[in-house]
Amino acid sequence: MEKEGALRAKRAAGERAAGMVEDGMVVGLGTGSTVKYAMERLAERQKEGLRILGIPTSFQTAIRARELGIPLTTLDVHPDPDIAIDGADQVDRSRRLIKGRGAALTREKIVAAAAGRLVIVVDGAKMVESLHGVVPTEVLPFALAPVLASLKTLGAAPVVREGVAKDGPVISDNGGFIVDAGFGLIRNPEEVERAITLIPGVICTGLFTAYTGKTSVVVGREKGEARVL
């Protein structure tokens, strides 16, 4: 169970991000515990007259949005959403990200790339000097063995993520396996992202380095405040 301070920080970040949404916007809705608070605040703002459409990045988010009464659309209808709100596992000083602990990284990256603005909501624990550790990577099941071998040649220690409350590997909303590739300190995230992406059979990597120019980071604090970077 999370501590109250951490929950206050997440709520503060999510609600601050929801305040950045303007009437009439199409909003990419990320996946995760901090985005949940943004969605709850957006639902409250709808009752105050806000009109929005949401594009969910996972089944979980779509279900939650419907429960909250947030009307949904698709990238087929709205290929260039105004803004996307999402979480992250790590954020460095250059606003480069590691994402994918929730196994929704592929759709999150598609929406992040399409959106005019990307707002990342995190608590202070997610802010790091340098990206490091596990990089979630979605992989076609057919290509699992050669992808694992290729990741090892890049210096990673890849592990197929196992499911919880199910036997066998985690299966993404797209039908892919999730491989957690441990890299240690990532000195050149752009280079590592390109190298992983070029491996045949990789669907998506959790390194997000191409969107720093349109990214704002909302950092929640345990006292219930939030600041925008």
Tell where the protein language model's regions lie, with residue ranges.
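N-terminal active-site beta-alpha-beta segment that forms phosphate/nucleotide-binding
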Residues: E2-D86, T212
